[in-house]
Structures are given as structure tokens and as C-alpha cells.
Regions:
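Symmetry-related core transmembrane helices of the 12-TM Major Facilitator Superfamily/SLC fold
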Residues: 153-172
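Central cavity-lining transmembrane alpha-helices of secondary-active solute carriers
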Residues: 46-60, 223-235
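Extracytoplasmic
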Residues: 11-30, 207-212
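C-terminal transmembrane helical hairpin of 12-TM major facilitator-type secondary transporters
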Residues: 246-258
Length: 258
């Protein structure tokens, strides 16, 4: 299971890692070459966030209909072309950032569901989620010495495409998750959790969009973020398995607050 988790981890590396968070490396180039304002750069981030939100909401329906394996690998292999075409201009970028958000959500949710179908393992899930850190680590190296946004997006697309190919050996080893059990309850018990998670998302999206404009050595910053995301997943997975999901989430959010 560990080997399959590591192979599937290339999904979060390509989707949320390179496709979503590495976007923060590109706004300075787009501002210099395209003349983008902070508001326009923020709209690109908002389009991506909206796409991710709608992709996450639609994941059970879409992935359940087409199959989790087809949905995961299809979205993963589309990451490369979508990212590569993002550098063609502002209006295409606005649409493609939305599309990438949808695809990134299907990758993240689909891969986790496929991994959980093999058996519940906090360590394996931690390794899978840590794949985001690999994308953060690769982003600065892919963009070394790049001065043109089109070249930057092409390199990110190439990196995402390579990561997608890396996940292919796991395909014959995976099985479809069982159909979800439909409940009749309301959202009352989890409403506070949804608000907390929404506020957390609103905070870190703004931070990850504009952090490179405030920090000079963004390669070092993303390296530290990548290492942290890559290895803390291996810690948090077993910890949440030990203390339970509710307490584990409280512990994670408390440390983020500090």
C-alpha cells in the first residue's frame, strides 16, 4: 500500500502543488510583462479557488459516474496542457485557472478515495497528502531564470505532465471505492467545522497568492514550505489516526493559528 500511496502522491504534487500553489511564483512575472495589477492577479487566484470549490462539491457525482480511476487519471493528465496554455494571455488564463481548480479538486479527492479503498492507513494518507509538498519543492526549480510568463506556465505544465506519467504504474493496482452511503441528516453537527475550514481557506489562499511579492528569496521560502508539507503529512497521518479526526483537525488548526 505504501508504494501505491507514493505513486498516487504525484497527483497532489501536480494538482494542488504545481497547479494551484506554484501559481504564487508567477504573478511577479505577469505583473512585469503583462502589466497585471494586484487586483487582476487576485482575480486569477479567485477563479482557481472557485473552480476548486465547485470541483470538490461535484467530485462525488462526477467521479462516481465516470469512475474514480478514470476521473483521477483523466484530470491528472489534463493538468499539463491546461497549465501550459495558461500563459497565452490574461483572459484565457482566467478561464484556465478555473478549469485547473476543478481538475485539481478531482485529483485530490479522487486519489484519496482510491487510496482509502485499499484500506484505512493514516501513514499512507499522510504520504499521499504530503505530495503537495513535492510540487512546492519542484516549482522554484522549474522556473529558474524564467523571465516570460508563457515560458513559466509551459514549464509548470511540463512538470505536471511528467508527474502524471509517474502515477500510471499504480493504475492496475487500484480498485473502485464502494458507493457512498446516503444519509438523511442535516449539516448542523458540522456547520461550525465548515465555517472554520472556510475561514482557514480564505486566509491561506490570499497568503499563497501574494507571498512572493513580499518575500525576496521565494525559492528558499517554497523550499521550506515544500519540505514542511512533504514530511509533516507523515506525522499528521498517524497522529490523526491515533487521536481521531475531530481532535486531529483541532490540533492542526491550532498550530496554524500560532
Amino acid at each position: 500500500m505504501a508504494a501505491r500511496a507514493l505513486l498516487l502522491a504525484s497527483g497532489p504534487a501536480a494538482g494542488p502543488g504545481l497547479g494551484r500553489f506554484a501559481y504564487a511564483l508567477v504573478p511577479p512575472l505577469m505583473q512585469a510583462v503583462w502589466g497585471l495589477s494586484y487586483a487582476e492577479a487576485g482575480f486569477l487566484g479567485s477563479a482557481n479557488t472557485l473552480g476548486y470549490f465547485l470541483g470538490a462539491l461535484s467530485s462525488p457525482l462526477v467521479l462516481g459516474r465516470v469512475g474514480y480511476r478514470l476521473g483521477f487519471y483523466g484530470a491528472l493528465l489534463l493538468q499539463g496542457p491546461v497549465l501550459a496554455l495558461t500563459g497565452t494571455g490574461y483572459l484565457p488564463a482566467l478561464l484556465l485557472r478555473f478549469v485547473q481548480g476543478v481538475l485539481g479538486a478531482w485529483i485530490f479527492v479522487g486519489g484519496a478515495a482510491l487510496l482509502m479503498a485499499l484500506g484505512r492507513s493514516g501513514r499512507a494518507l499522510g504520504a499521499y497528502y504530503g505530495g503537495v509538498g513535492l510540487g512546492l519543492l519542484l516549482g522554484p526549480w522549474l522556473l529558474l531564470a524564467v523571465q516570460d510568463p508563457a515560458v513559466a506556465w509551459a514549464r509548470l505544465g511540463l512538470g505536471a505532465g511528467a508527474l502524471g506519467l509517474f502515477a500510471l504504474p499504480a493504475l492496475p493496482l487500484l480498485q473502485e471505492p464502494p458507493p457512498p452511503v446516503r444519509g438523511k441528516g442535516d449539516l448542523g453537527p458540522v456547520r461550525a467545522l465548515l465555517w472554520a475550514y472556510g475561514l482557514y481557506g480564505a486566509g491561506y489562499i490570499g497568503y499563497m497568492t501574494f507571498v512572493t511579492t513580499a518575500v525576496g528569496d521565494w525559492a528558499l521560502l517554497f523550499g521550506l514550505l515544500g519540505v514542511g508539507a512533504l514530511f509533516t503529512g507523515l506525522f499528521w497521518g498517524p497522529w490523526v489516526e491515533r487521536v481521531g479526526g475531530r481532535r486531529g483537525l483541532v490540533h492542526v488548526l491550532f498550530l496554524l493559528f500560532l
